[in-house]
A protein has these predicted regions:
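N-terminal "arm"/small-domain region of PLP-dependent enzymes with the aminotransferase-like
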Residues: 1-30, 35
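PLP-dependent aminotransferase class I/II
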Residues: 8, 20, 35-43, 47-53, ...
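Phosphate-binding glycine-rich loop
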Residues: 30-77, 91-95, 101
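PLP-dependent aminotransferase-like
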Residues: 68-147
């Protein structure tokens, strides 16, 4: 195994907070659509400065809903990184669009310098993938996406 991210340091720093949150959910007895979900949705929408935040069951559902909300479907292309998990690709295919892969940079993230060349008339979205505690260069990606 190649260790690229020491998640245990982060977990150790937040362990009590995580265990307390899980304990509260189980003590409440409502595992689905409970008060913790509502609290998360409110905080998420506030943090993102949007009207609504909707908790879903998994990444595939979240990306599929986002693509459908943007009317992305058959005949469209969505750019993402070649270094991604199956849910990213599954969501794009679920929406009816085609996947266009862009290679990675030295940090294993989408190579921003290659995105522009991948764009064509069918391109409707770019889905960056943040990995190993690293963020993609979202400012650069958003600047490309706005064009």
């Amino acid at each position: 195994m190649i260790k690229v991210w020491d998640y245990l340091k982060e977990y150790d720093a937040m362990r009590e907070e995580i265990l307390d949150a899980v304990d509260q959910v189980f003590k409440n007895g409502v595992l689905v659509f409970g008060p913790k979900l509502q609290e998360f949705e409110e905080k998420f929408s506030e943090y993102n400065q949007c009207k609504f935040g909707i908790g879903v069951g998994n990444c595939t559902d979240a990306i599929t809903i986002a693509l459908r909300a943007c009317n992305i479907g058959s005949g469209d292309e969505v750019i993402t990184t070649s270094n991604t998990a199956v849910p990213t690709v599954t969501a794009i295919v679920n929406s009816g669009a085609s996947v266009k892969f862009v290679d990675i940079n030295e940090y294993s993230l989408i190579d921003v310098s290659k995105i522009t060349n991948a764009i064509n008339d069918k391109t409707k979205a770019i889905i960056p993938v943040h990995l190993y505690g690293q963020m993609c260069d979202m400012n650069a990606i958003m600047n490309i996406a706005k064009k």
